[in-house]
Amino acid sequence: MRFASLFVVYCTFMFLDISHVKCEVEPVPYCKVITWYDVKCGADGNKTCVDHLIKGHIYDVPVCDCSELTTSGILCTCQHRFPCKEPPPLHRISIRKQIRG
């Protein structure tokens, strides 16, 4: 009986000790991506930007903000969760060419 009582007391203290431990959890950083496309935002600009990014197999599921440019095209400012991935080199070159000329 004595060992059973000690075991119950031990388990109770272990439960209290474990339940009061505070963990420091670091927030997962967002990755910011800004891309330009020669289309219109339309009724749902967020969906337009997400569709273009997924179509190019660049990012998994970004959250985007679509801004119409005064000249032509749209500017998609997107954020998605870790891990941050750079666009493929060919995509960056095509974006730069579109912006410059």
UniProtKB/Swiss-Prot annotation:
GO terms for biological process: defense response to fungus; killing of cells of another organism; signal transduction. InterPro entries: SCRL (IPR010682). Its main location: secreted. One of its GO terms (cellular component) is extracellular region. It is found in: Secreted. The keyword Disulfide bond applies. Keywords: Antimicrobial, Disulfide bond, Fungicide, Plant defense, Secreted, Signal. Residues 1-23 form the signal peptide. It comes from the Eukaryota. Belongs to the DEFL family. This is Putative defensin-like protein 253. It comes from Arabidopsis thaliana. The lineage of its organism: Eukaryota, Viridiplantae, Streptophyta, Embryophyta, Tracheophyta.
